[in-house]
A protein has these predicted regions:
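Nucleotide and nucleotide-moiety/phosphate-recognizing core
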Residues: 2-157, 165-181, 186-200
Length: 201
């Protein structure tokens, strides 16, 4: 059985929507809903963050929270800091504001694993048909990510795309845009609430 840990990204400055991870998404705050999607007894699960949570939110996340060693370097810093603490061979990284990312997507990514593959990353297409990746809903070989991610960060860069290029990565076309819905602005949040209503109906 493949050893897979869960890494929930809950850092970021959220300048356009402060406190977004604590906003209600159905019956739970946004980040707690993401945690619930993947919570399993015995599954290694961590939260990467750049701040301590309010007690009421912290109580809904009964897993270790790791403070990012590299502030203002994007999700890469939080992923590297947290993966260094983890033990699972593979890590599924998921954004804390993406409540429609579910174990069904993780199962699809796991099915694409091969001995030589170091990352499986969903690929979508924009309105013009140009492909783009979803690195915050992706599966990574933990040791390989640490090996290739640290040089990128130490070179003064923070782009996950650069790390993925250094990995033996496999992309998986995924057409369902709802899965990757996240929240950066008040209008995003309004759209998410509308989508949640349709999703739960």
């Amino acid at each position: 059985m493949t050893s897979v840990g869960i890494l929930i990204l809950a850092g970021g400055e959220a300048t356009r929507l402060p406190g977004k991870l604590a906003l209600a998404a159905g019956d739970l705050p946004l980040v707690a809903r993401v945690y619930r999607n993947f919570a399993q007894p015995g599954r290694e699960t961590y939260v990467a963050t750049n701040r301590t949570f309010a007690p009421e939110l912290d109580a809904l996340l009964p897993v270790p929270a790791v403070i990012d060693r590299w502030s203002r370097r994007g999700p890469l810093g939080g992923m590297l800091t947290t993966m260094a603490r983890m033990r699972s061979r593979f890590v599924f990284a998921v954004a804390g504001d993406a409540p429609f990312v579910t174990p069904a997507l993780l199962a699809l990514l796991l099915a694409e694993l091969r001995p030589e593959v170091e990352a499986v990353v969903p690929e979508r297409r924009d309105e013009d048909g140009k492909p783009f990746l979803e690195p915050l809903a992706a599966l990574y070989d933990r040791a390989a990510f640490l090996r290739e991610g640290l040089p990128v960060l130490r070179a003064g860069r923070g782009a996950l795309q650069l790390v993925i290029r250094r990995l033996r990565a496999h992309t998986l076309p995924v057409a369902d845009g709802l899965t990757f819905t996240n929240v950066n602005t008040p209008s995003d949040y309004a759209a998410l609430l509308q989508a949640l209503g349709q999703y739960n109906s």
